[in-house]
Amino acid sequence: MSGLEIEFTGFLTDSLSLDMNLGFLDSEVTSDYEALDNVDIYQYFFGEEDLRYGLRENVKGNQLAKTPEFTADITIKYETNLPSGNSLTTVAQYVKRGKFQQRVNNNPVVDSIRAYTIGNLTTSIGFSDSLAVDFMVLNVTDEAGVNSSMTDVFGVAATGLELIPPRQIMTRLRYSF
């Protein structure tokens, strides 16, 4: 496995900043290793061990589990003081998670997880050091994506998907003490 992670924070002006985190990853099984894919073997039971054993596969060359080749989180933030004396902070965030394989078996039926891209927007008004209100739109484009999946965790030959949250529009009141 090899990769590169880049973290960058830049102040573009007195009130505008850019925060960028990028990850590049190349993951691959480089040695011979035989594994059983429980998705393929679930129908064989006691007395059929030889059939199960015959279904083993060499995973050399397969992508490691849960290792997207590319991830990005780019955030631009604008901060200023309003004429009223209140503070204003606006944040726009871009998040990209590349495709990956859920398990080292790389079974195309259950292991391929698609890439997704989402955007988040937040505006905050600070009335004092202890009181603020936030207006948020998360997953602005209402992207339907899969964060993760789990295959055959309980031996029932099923795959469960963990979805990313849909678009959310929220208001939050913050009080610090």
Predicted segments with their positions:
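Hydrophobic, well-ordered secondary-structure elements that form the walls
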Residues: 6, 20, 76, 92, ...
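Surface-exposed coil/turn segments at beta-strand junctions on protein surfaces, enriched
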Residues: 11-13, 83, 114, 126, ...
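Gram-negative outer-membrane beta-barrel transporters
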Residues: 1-103
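Short, local alpha-helical segments
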Residues: 103-107, 115-120
